Design a protein with these regions (language model features):
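A "functional boundary" signal
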Residues: 2-8, 21-173
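Bacterial N-terminal signal peptides
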Residues: 8-17
Length: 173
């Protein structure tokens, strides 16, 4: 009796999952057609808006990846920085290793675009990941490095972000 119920539940769940994926794919296909007809600058703006509108949805990552490609093609540092920020934010919750790789790629983009908030915010997220991994040594070495960069770049908000991360570290331990 229980086996039949479990099988029926699994079938219902998988059917729902399949239909949701098909619906999402068709929406993205339609969007691809609309985006292809837009001028370059409008395409960047639309992709950026779509990525920021769906922060809790998987399509958020897809839009951010499309924004990254489009911004690279158009050599637009502003939107390139936005795309990196969104992808780092996504991977912060899903895949720390990918987050760190993207962070290395994004740092020069953030600095060249003078987007210090994104630079320091993402560097500080890295401190939180070391805290989650219980890597105390890296928590403090990264904090020290970021504080030094904050001073060099004359961006006191960077130090504030680090102070919050360290306060969180101490309150969690």
């Amino acid at each position: 009796m229980y086996k039949k119920q479990i099988v029926l539940i699994l079938i219902a769940l998988s059917t729902t999952f399949i239909f949701d994926n098909v619906r999402a794919a068709s929406t993205l296909d339609s969007l691809e057609q609309v985006l292809a007809r837009l001028p370059d600058s409008a395409r960047l703006i639309k992709l950026n808006d779509l990525a920021y509108q769906n922060p809790d949805d998987y399509s958020y990552k897809i839009y951010a990846e499309k924004l990254l490609k489009e911004a690279e093609q158009q050599k637009n540092n502003k939107y390139l920085g936005n795309a990196y920020f969104l992808l780092i934010k996504y991977h912060y919750s899903h895949d720390i290793d990918s987050m760190r790789l993207l962070l290395k790629e994004a740092e020069p983009v953030f600095l060249n675009g003078n987007n210090l908030e994104y630079f320091f915010r993402t560097k500080t997220w890295n401190i939180y990941t070391y805290e989650q991994q219980e890597n105390d040594e890296r928590v403090f070495s990264e904090a020290k490095l970021i504080n030094k960069l904050s001073e060099q770049l004359n961006y006191p908000e960077g130090k504030e972000m680090v102070d919050q991360a360290i306060a969180h570290y101490y309150s969690s331990n």
